[in-house]
């Protein structure tokens, strides 16, 4: 199955796993996260997000299609993850999440920085 139109670069599975882990770790260590498209959009709009996670299996894709562009505009790093179900679990909710944002990484600070560096390298190779 091809990727939805809003996915601008390929994220390796191990990087996606790191992103889930960073979200989980930030939440569990007293950091601050936002869950869901609306909260994530507001956090990006206000420039509060340190890292945005966007699920690739969102239907309809228009729900999150604005997020990569908004993140680019606000210079906020973002990463794609394959599953909205796993994203919801990592965010600590019992439902799926199309998107999430790490506001304060807490104990996941180093992991978040590592993810941002990897994403920047992937985007540079993709010419973005």
Curated annotation (Swiss-Prot):
Keywords, comma-separated and alphabetical: Cytoplasm, Ribonucleoprotein, Ribosomal protein, RNA-binding, rRNA-binding, tRNA processing
Localization annotation: Cytoplasm
GO molecular function list: ribonuclease P activity; rRNA binding; structural constituent of ribosome
GO cellular component, one term: ribosome
Function in brief: Multifunctional RNA-binding protein that recognizes the K-turn motif in ribosomal RNA, the RNA component of RNase P, box H/ACA, box C/D and box C'/D' sRNAs.
HAMAP family xrefs: Ribosomal_eL8
Family to which the UniProt record says this protein belongs: Belongs to the eukaryotic ribosomal protein eL8 family.
Protein name: Large ribosomal subunit protein eL8
The species this protein was found in: Ignicoccus hospitalis (strain KIN4/I / DSM 18386 / JCM 14125)
Gene that this polypeptide is encoded by: rpl7ae
């Amino acid at each position: 199955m091809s990727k939805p139109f809003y996915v601008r670069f390929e994220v390796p599975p191990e990087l996606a796993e790191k992103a889930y882990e960073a979200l989980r770790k930030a939440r569990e260590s007293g950091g601050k996260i936002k869950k869901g498209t609306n909260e994530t959009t507001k956090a990006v709009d206000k420039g509060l997000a340190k890292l945005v996670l966007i699920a690739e299996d969102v239907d309809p894709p228009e729900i999150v299609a604005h997020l990569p562009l908004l993140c680019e505009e606000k210079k906020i790093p973002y990463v794609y993850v394959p599953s909205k179900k796993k994203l919801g679990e990592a965010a600590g909710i019992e439902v799926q999440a199309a998107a999430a944002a790490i506001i304060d990484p807490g104990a996941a600070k180093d992991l978040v920085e590592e993810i941002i560096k990897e994403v920047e390298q992937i985007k540079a190779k993709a010419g973005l």
